[in-house]
Swiss-Prot record:
Cystine pairings recorded for this chain: 62-78, 158-234, 191-215, 224-252
Family matches, as InterPro entries: Peptidase_S1_PA, Peptidase_S1_PA_chymotrypsin, Peptidase_S1A, Trypsin_dom, TRYPSIN_HIS, TRYPSIN_SER
The name this protein goes by in its record: Serine protease 29
Free-text function comment from the UniProt entry: Involved in embryo hatching and implantation.
Keyword NAD: no
């Protein structure tokens, strides 16, 4: 099911990038303007699954990133319910192809950021604790978290990955291989200006791009439906660093509408606190 989410805060008609898929054959899974990722290139990428009784199948719902052998960071809007039952989720790790292969991993704990209400209001992050450690799994490796002082700019080499739709109206075709695309970081003030100019009177006087958000994308290259919760990584001093979590945007890869991400840097204290508390 492809859900066009209208953010009531600013009446945009903007879309959440990751939503439950309709079924294993028609699943809205690709990155707009990207290409297939080699096996093992992005070893922290995971697929967050929910069970569809109609098909008796665990379908792709969102992306996520392994940040510790037993912890996954994703978007809060992928979880939806603050008291979500961990047993309704499964995690797929270490595979470029969405279906087939390894067994799915169980989730033992779900933690949504306490300030989350809606993706457009910020705090769009959640943690999933895995029932088992993936320390010894092949093609699996945690991604590096940013330092509190890290500043990423348009000069940095950044990529976003996922199994989301390859255009606003076209799902990723079989064999459902992980997609990757290089995107440009866009300064928050410029991103704010772009959204305001493109939507004009619909958001007059309302701040759209908050401090805990990050913008990235190019016309024709972006994350899309089914990518939510997935990683935006930048090559910082030779190491891939997780700087963003796919959150929301207006359509996919449209001119003047960059993708909007949860800024991982803003949530470092919360992430560290939760992992220490429950590990």
């Amino acid at each position: 099911m492809l859900i066009q989410l209208c953010l009531t805060l600013f009446f945009l008609g903007c879309s959440i990038a990751g939503t439950p898929a309709p079924g294993p054959e028609d699943v809205l899974m690709g990155i707009v303007g990207g290409h297939s990722a080699p096996q093992g290139k992005w070893p922290w990428q995971v697929s967050l699954r929910i069970y569809r009784y109609y098909w008796a199948f665990w379908v792709h719902n969102c992306g996520g990133s392994i940040i510790h052998p037993q912890w996954v960071l994703t978007a809060a809007h992928c979880i939806r319910e603050r008291d979500a039952d961990p047993s309704v989720f499964r995690i797929r790790v270490g595979e470029a192809y969405l279906y087939g292969g390894k067994e799915l991993l169980s989730v033992s704990r779900v933690i949504i950021h306490p300030d989350f209400v809606h993706a457009g209001l910020g705090s769009d992050v959640a943690l999933l604790q895995l029932a088992v450690s993936v320390q010894s799994f092949p093609n699996v490796k945690p991604v590096k978290l940013p330092s509190e002082s890290l500043e990423v700019t348009k000069k940095d080499v950044c990529w976003v990955t996922g199994w989301g739709a390859v255009s606003t109206h076209r799902s990723l075709p079989p064999p459902y291989r992980l997609q990757q695309v290089q995107v440009k970081i866009i300064d928050n003030s410029l991103c704010e200006e772009m959204y305001h100019n493109a939507t004009r009177h619909r958001n007059r006087g309302q701040k759209l791009i908050l401090k805990d958000m990050l913008c990235a994308g190019n016309q024709g290259q972006d994350s899309c439906y089914g990518d939510s919760g997935g990683p935006l990584v930048c090559n910082v001093t030779g190491s891939w660093t997780l700087v963003g979590v796919v959150s929301w945007g207006y359509g996919c890869a449209l001119r003047d509408f960059p993708g909007v991400y949860a800024r991982v840097q803003s949530f470092l204290p919360w992430i560290t606190q939760q992992m220490q508390r429950f590990s």
